C-alpha cells in the first residue's frame, strides 16, 4: 500500500515555528517517526510545498497511491482549488492538523476540504499523522477484503 504524506505552507518550519503550538520535532523528524510506525507493507512518500499549485499538482499525481494524508496548513480554510483536486482523484484523503484548530482562532474553525475527505484528525500533535495512516490502512483493508 502506498500513502502520500503531503504537507502545505509553513510546515517546513516544524520544530522552529511556534513550538508551543506545533512541537519541537522537525518535518524530517516527523517523516522518520512515521516511517518507523508504518507497517512493512506500507510505503510512505513525503512532499511539502508552500505553494498552492504545487500541492494541487501533487494531489493530481496521487492517482498511483492508495491514500493521502494531507495537512494543507492555512490553505485548509481558503482553497477551493485544493478541494477540487481532492475531489478529482480516486485516492481517499485524510485531512490532518497538528493543533486543535477548533480551539484556536475562529477563522481556523472552517475547513474547505473536510467535506471531500474521508475524515479529519486534529489536535493530537504529530500523532495526528500516525492516526491518519492507520485510518487509511483500515479504510483500504475494509475495501479490499
UniProtKB/Swiss-Prot annotation:
Pfam families per record: DHquinase_II (PF01220)
Protein name: 3-dehydroquinate dehydratase
Similarity annotation: Belongs to the type-II 3-dehydroquinase family.
Gene: aroQ
Record has Lyase as a keyword: yes
EC number assigned by the record: 4.2.1.10
Reactions it catalyzes: 3-dehydroquinate = 3-dehydroshikimate + H2O
GO molecular function, one term: 3-dehydroquinate dehydratase activity
InterPro entries in UniProt: DHquinase_II (IPR001874), DHquinase_II_CS (IPR018509), DHquinase_II_sf (IPR036441)
